[in-house]
């Protein structure tokens, strides 16, 4: 039986020993994994830790503001926010292969972290890597940017949650007193919306994806299903379909909805979702977001599918 209090005590001591009197930075996304890793590390080394949030331009709506409010204002962590939108989007121009996208994003993250580390004289990079991340990477299912790190990286990596699964991390978050908005926050892929925009990442598709995800999250929460579902999100497919706007033909993007239940992300199943909820989401996406012709719902379990499309 997992004992969160015991784990916290042991992890804090282990982090102290690993980092010692050196400075460290942590890659902070605002999700539960990196948040727990940040609080544990802060308990261990205090102000020798600097949290770094990289605004890649691939984040959810309001993500940056939420991170600043929670970690700088409420939790009092040293927080650096890096605006790297142009850098990431330029590097992704013309790239359609999902593994290539993940590798480009992973390399850019490390470049940014190493630059910050050099500025503040940090020697250690703390990450919120959990067990499913490295299991999927080793199994060559898909690369996780926080596992497939580039050779020659100068920072030493510390991963206090490496052997844990998401349900255990949530128990730690509760024990550490993190707000419910973080404890129950649904998992979000490290490469962000880049893997929810199939094919080439463009500003148009990113904007559609960001707005569609905001609508899905809002409607699922209104239906009180947010704590019941493991993940619920929207994906912009790399193809278009014919639709009708007024009396005119249109040829625009297809948005796919994905909603699954899971305990640890190693397997997942699609539950029966109220049809009126799906209809509401579809109506809002097609009426509120320009250039969307159609909304579809993915009913594939994991396996054979993965939870994310890319």
From Swiss-Prot:
Keywords on record: ATP-binding, GMP biosynthesis, Ligase, Nucleotide-binding, Purine biosynthesis
EC number(s) from the headed UniProt entry: 6.3.5.2
Pathway: Purine metabolism; GMP biosynthesis; GMP from XMP (L-Gln route): step 1/1
Domain of life: Archaea
Record-linked Pfam families: GMP_synt_C, NAD_synthase
Any one annotated GO CC term: cytosol
GO molecular function: ATP binding; GMP synthase activity
Gene3D superfamilies associated with the record: 3.30.300.10, HUPs
Subunit structure: Heterodimer composed of a glutamine amidotransferase subunit (A) and a GMP-binding subunit (B).
Protein name (record): GMP synthase [glutamine-hydrolyzing] subunit B
Native source species: Methanocaldococcus jannaschii (strain ATCC 43067 / DSM 2661 / JAL-1 / JCM 10045 / NBRC 100440)
Gene: guaAB
């Amino acid at each position: 039986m997992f004992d969160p209090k015991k784990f916290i005590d042991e992890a804090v001591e282990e982090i102290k020993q690993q980092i010692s009197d050196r400075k460290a930075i942590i890659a902070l996304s605002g999700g539960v994994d990196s948040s727990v890793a940040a609080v544990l590390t802060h308990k261990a080394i205090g102000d020798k830790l600097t949290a770094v949030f990289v605004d890649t331009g691939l984040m959810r709506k309001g993500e940056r503001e939420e991170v600043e409010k929670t970690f700088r204002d409420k939790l009092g962590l040293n927080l650096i926010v890096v605006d790297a939108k142009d850098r990431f989007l330029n590097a992704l121009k013309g790239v359609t292969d999902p593994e290539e996208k993940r590798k480009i994003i992973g390399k850019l993250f490390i470049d940014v972290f190493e630059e910050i580390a050099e500025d503040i004289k940090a020697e250690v990079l703390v990450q919120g890597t959990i067990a499913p991340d490295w299991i999927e990477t080793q199994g060559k299912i898909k690369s996780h940017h926080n596992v497939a790190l580039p050779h020659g990286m100068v920072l030493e990596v510390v991963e206090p949650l490496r052997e844990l699964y998401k349900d255990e991390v949530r128990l730690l978050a509760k024990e550490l007193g993190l707000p419910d908005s973080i404890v129950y926050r649904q998992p979000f892929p490290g490469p962000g919306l880049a893997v929810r925009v199939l094919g080439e990442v463009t500003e148009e598709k990113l904007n559609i994806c960001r707005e569609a995800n905001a609508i899905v999250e809002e409607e699922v929460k209104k239906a009180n299903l947010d704590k019941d579902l493991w993940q619920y999100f929207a994906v912009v497919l790399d193809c278009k379909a014919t639709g009708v706007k007024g009396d005119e033909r249109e040829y625009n993007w297809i948005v796919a909805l994905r909603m699954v239940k899971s305990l640890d992300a190693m397997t997942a199943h699609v539950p029966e979702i109220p049809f009126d909820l799906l209809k509401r989401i579809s109506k809002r996406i097609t009426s509120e977001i320009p250039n969307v012709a159609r909304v579809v719902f993915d009913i594939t379990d994991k396996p054979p599918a993965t939870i994310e499309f890319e």
